[in-house]
Amino acid sequence: MVTTPDGSPVAMVHCNNCTSDLNAWVGLFKQYQELLGVPVDMNEVFSKLYNHALKGDADCGGLIAYNYISGEPVTGLAEGRPMFVRSANDHFNLANFMRANLYASVAVLKIGNDVLFKNEKVQVDRITGHGGLFKTKGVGQRILAAAINSPISVMETAGEGGAWGIALLAGYLVNNDEKLSLADYLDKKVFAGNTGVEIAPTAEDVAGFDKYIVTYKAGLAIEQAAVANKK
């Protein structure tokens, strides 16, 4: 059993991939700008593309992406092949392309959390996001809120990335002279009344992501075929 340092049980959804494949796609747009002789500011490139994704269809127009640089146990893949898939009649444009890849970055997380929230009836007070996905203000937060149908809070330093959660647990063990419980340590020492900025999911986004994930799950056979046939 996985527990916190103070012995509380942990329900954990482990994902091997997040934004590595998405970053590779953004890198192509960087190369295109360089071909045009346009000075490249990567913060601007990410901001423009991420915010443009929010103009896409809530279900990404039928487009799906698999960000599987490596395998994903949650979906039964021991290996992965990054892949973008569309049908000829899907709504293919830049906004939907970017949105599909943003959805892909948290799709496995959604599948795992759906088991916890919908099947196991796990309830949470709030979810705090941290990592590079949240560096572009509001976008990753909105995508994750739609994925797990829950308000998402981010702190001011959310975009810095790193193993934030495990660092907090280490801090609890090393810097807890008052011998507080983990819950009290988080409330009094880490958040100290500052729960960050919260974004709640919209009904349209949630319905769109749910539709996307149905197509995503159906297409896992394509990912399996790629693993079997592309070395």
Show where each model-derived region lies.
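Active-site core segments that coordinate phosphate-bearing ligands/cofactors
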Residues: 1-128, 133-231
